[in-house]
Each structure stands twice: as C-alpha cells, then as structure tokens.
Regions:
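Cytosolic covalent-transfer regions centered on His/Cys nucleophiles
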Residues: 1-155
Length: 155
C-alpha cells in the first residue's frame, strides 16, 4: 500500500446539526459508504461498538474513530472536518472539529490496524501538523496536505 489518503475520503464542512457524537459517526459512515447501505450500517455499528469501549476523542479538538470490519477488502482512511464542534467525550473534555477515521479488515489487527493508529496518533500529537491541517481552507488543500504529510503504510 503506497498511501492511505484518497481524495474521495476527505470531507470538509460535514454537517452535524445536533453537535453530538452519535450523529457525527452516522454522518461519517454515510459519507464513507458512498451509498452502500449495508456497508454504512456496518460502519455505524463498528464505530458505536468501539465508542462503547472508550471514547476515541483524542483531545485538542480531534477524534480518531476507528474500527475493524471482517471482509473489508482494504483499509479505509478518511478525514472529516465538521461544520461545528461536536461533543465527543474527549479525554480533555473539549468538543471535536476534526475526525481522522481508520477502518481496517477485521483480520488485520497486527499487520495494518495498529500501525495505522500509531502513525495517526504520532502525527496528531505534532502541534505544527495539526495547526497546518486546520489552516487548510478547503477539501483540495486538506487532501494535498494529508497526502504530503502522511507516510506510506506497509501492508
């Protein structure tokens, strides 16, 4: 796998009218599923199951919703910037405006899932990376910034 970044998985100004995590996860699932209702429902269920274990609110206005889904052909990475802050039960108690999403095949715990999460966590702890990410003004800038900054993930 060369890169996990795909242009069609960068979402800007995602509407979350209620400002609640449940609706945000539903919106992310809908956008990522691209009109595949069965896949959308799997994503929603997988994200909710993970959130029931612990919040994926990373802190600093960022969440890393992630899940594993059996039978998934390849890992999915998405970036969603919300139209308003979302209450997420983050570790710092602050609402979330950016969600960095990782979904991997259920069989890929050691091979792909953990390396992707570790790489994302390292990048998101870098204040300069996050500041420049937030400075992107549209979907195109977000895409090219992420493409340039995220290293390839070895499958």
């Amino acid at each position: 796998m060369d890169t996990i970044v795909r242009r069609d998985m960068i979402f800007d100004n995602v509407q979350v009218c209620s400002g609640q995590k449940r609706e945000a996860l539903r919106a992310i699932s809908h956008l990522c599923a691209k009109d595949d209702m069965a896949y959308e429902l799997k994503l929603i269920a997988a994200f909710r199951e993970r959130e029931a274990l612990y919040s994926t609110g990373f802190g600093g206005g960022i969440a890393i919703p992630h899940a594993r889904i059996n039978g998934l052909a390849e890992p999915l990475f998405a970036l969603a910037r919300f139209d308003r802050p979302v209450e997420w039960d983050a570790i710092d108690g602050k609402p979330v405006d950016l969600a960095v999403v990782a979904v991997t095949p259920g069989e890929a715990e050691r091979d792909i899932h953990l390396p992707i999460l570790a790489m994302l966590a390292r990048k998101l702890m870098d204040e300069n990376f996050v500041r420049r990410l937030r400075a992107c003004t549209d979907k195109t800038q977000l895409y090219y910034y992420m493409l340039r900054e995220l290293p390839p993930v070895k499958a």
